[in-house]
Amino acid sequence: MPRLSKLIEKLEDRLSGKWGRWYARHKAKLPVYIPLGLGAWYLYGMFVNSLRLGKQSVFNTTGEVIESIWVFNPFKNLIAPFTPFGLGVTAVIALLICLITKKGYSWLSGYKFVRDKRGFDILPDGTHGTSGFMDKKERARILETGPVDQLAGTVLGKYKDDPEDDDKYAEYVTLKKGSGLTEHTMVYGATGAGKSRGFVKPFILQCAKRARLGLQGAKDSLGQVCQPESLILVDPKGEFYESMSGFLRDEGFEVRLFNLLDMENSDAWNCLADATEDPNLVQSIAEVIINNTSNSEERQDFWSKAELNLLVALIHYVIRLKGPDGKLLPIHERSLGAIYRLLSSESFQSLEEIMNSLPKDHPAKAPYGIFKLANRQIWGNIAIGLGNRLAVFQNPLVDKITAYNEIDMTLPGRKPCAYFCAISDQDSSLEFLSSLFFSQLFSRLMNYARREGDGGRLPVTVNVCLEEFCNIGKLIDFKKTLSVCRSRGIHCQLIVQSISQLSDRYEKKEWEELIGNCDIQICLGCNDQMTAEYISDKCGSVTIRVNNNQFPLMPLFSPVYGTTRP
């Protein structure tokens, strides 16, 4: 049972908070409110005294002469409302108000409706829907509110009892641990809506706080030991790395930058290095490249499929290249750039001789054999098409940052890391590289969790914040990844400009599955009709009171004749 001092302290905090908010809202008008309040008090006391003296003059049994029922003495008028007669008058007036007004009727009858600030009454019947904002009990069950330094979850917004309250009385809102909701988040925000400032930067700070608590072995609100966390972030302008990387290093994060915007300042990542360790990745690497360099009509045509088989064969060949000593070549000689150089420098006859010289059990033989089922006369055309898809490797910087391997894809699941992927918001020719980066990230982390994790979960929780989600290229089968990665200890935050943009990138209702996997959806603002209608429909319907007034319209000066047909 709580101690009396605690209850008193809690009551004082509540009263001081309410009084403080009221004072902040009305501070400028207090010089007007105070005289008006005193005047109203004085006039009401005069009214009570007039009723009392009027009653005495009508039912006078003492013979006392009452000259006037009006009293102007301010002391008598200010005291009158608190006399037994004054309290009785006040009670009668309050009862009449309850009987006359709708609010009073709801108090007496128990039929409680809510008066909306937009000017209509929300009824409890639920005939046409029961949607509405959370009340305090519902918020306490799902959300945590309070000062941001006392919260560790992802900041979802601010809450104020009254929109007119000062910001210092606002409480930050985060998802409560153990609420039953997934931490996958979908954020909608048009250009300039504040996605970076309002969501991403607070998300980074809260992630760093949780990682620090995890390293310290602190306990969360459920009494469980906090788990260390990592952060993988899309950085469309390079601003997050510039402003937050030093802070994250000081917090103990291993920081890496895969920079497709300013490649001379990038850490290197070779996707074929991961394929060397896990050959099952070869097919997915080839599919990501083909799908992200094709339009929707080309992805299933003959040429794309033929180029896919040729690319799979070349990847299998390159990742197994050996030197004269019989050992695998250094990783920087086994890259996508090496495949492009093989296509551009070797004649197709030389490529044919290389493939024919491979052992029969070599993994490159099967996809190359399927490629050769095409008419021999178009083999060169297929090779030219694949070379065009890989043309970005003509750039020495692109070749360099994809040759060496300085970014470990499984490290974020083993220790706190902060990986930034800087992408261009103008040039789409490198989208397949950012898509490859995140496709392999999810694949490698989930495989590591399945094989090495405790109960199939990563030792370190990984947060993947996909800012400008639609501009990183299409992630193959991401709807399946999103539906299962939570159980592996991976949480995703998808940030898009609009639903129309999302549906353009992920077609055939796939975008609906992505949204359906996100229990938390935040709308920072939208300009398109599709997003506005979706959010409105998602909010649901509510039952309101509708008043219909009907009366006949009759002319003032002309008689109305009623006629009937025989």
Where are the model-predicted features located?
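Accessory regions of macromolecular translocation/handling assemblies
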Residues: M1-E229, Y241-F253, R320, Q550-P566
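P-loop NTPase motor domains
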Residues: R3, K168-Y169, K176-I490, R505-Y506, ...
